Regions:
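Interfacial segments of multi-pass membrane proteins
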Residues: 98-101, 114-137
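Interfacial loop-to-transmembrane junctions
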Residues: 176-201
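Small-residue-enriched transmembrane helix starts and helix-helix packing motifs
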Residues: 71, 87-103
Length: 213
């Protein structure tokens, strides 16, 4: 577990040291630009949906179908996807495709990490490598969303809500770190099947309730 956390930490160190070098031959610089490329689609889609309105997406039937449907897609990707590529093998096009997949996470129930891992597996990434890139890609995406919400609360003068939001971010960060440990430990020898089963069960339950069964 510690090794997994240190691996991600080392990758981030490399990014911070060499991000300003526009050179895909440098590992740290390449990873930085891959993350940037993978983040841009979600930022654009998020701003577009925000201006259009997202309330209609919060329907329990939509959530149920996305949880169930993307659980099946993850199962297919994990079964059919090759397991030979690592983060260092990713190209700008790969990062863009993963970033486009991440846009689907704007639909409630999709799971940001789940959909990015799914695309990574379709692109032939090793399970642990797909999970690592999904986690690295989450940093700017979640940070941008948090800053946007914080700015909106600040401009409305709702400082109490800002405190609540900060508490939520803190707890979310703690549980995210815990999730990293658990996922990396599990993926050493296992597949995504338990996560697929969880999504199938939860999605089915929500749909049955939504349709009155």
């Amino acid at each position: 577990l510690v090794g997994s956390e240190m691996c991600i930490r080392d990758r981030l160190k490399g990014v911070f040291k060499t991000w300003f070098i526009p050179n895909f031959k440098n590992a740290g610089s390449k990873l930085f630009w891959l993350i940037v490329i993978g983040t841009i689609p979600a930022v654009i889609a998020g701003l577009a949906l925000k201006s259009y309105g997202m309330e209609w997406l919060r329907d329990s039937r939509i959530i149920g179908w996305t949880i169930l449907g993307f659980g099946i897609v993850l199962f297919i990707a994990d079964k059919l996807g090759m397991t030979i590529r690592q983060i260092k093998h990713l190209t700008a096009l790969d990062a863009l495709l993963i970033g486009l997949a991440q846009c689907l996470a704007l639909i409630p129930g999709t799971s940001r990490s789940g959909i990015t891992i799914t695309m990574g597996r379709f692109l032939g990434m090793e399970r642990r490598e797909a999970a690592k890139f999904a986690m690295l890609l989450s940093i700017p995406t979640i940070a941008a969303a948090g800053m946007l919400v914080g700015w909106e609360l600040y401009t409305t003068g709702n400082f109490q809500e800002i405190i609540y939001a900060m508490d939520g971010i803190t707890y979310s960060f703690i549980f995210s770190i815990l999730a990293i440990y658990i996922i990396m430990w599990w993926l050493k020898k296992s597949t995504f099947l338990p996560f697929v089963v969880y999504r199938l069960c939860l999605g089915t339950y929500l749909l049955l309730n939504s349709y009155g069964y």
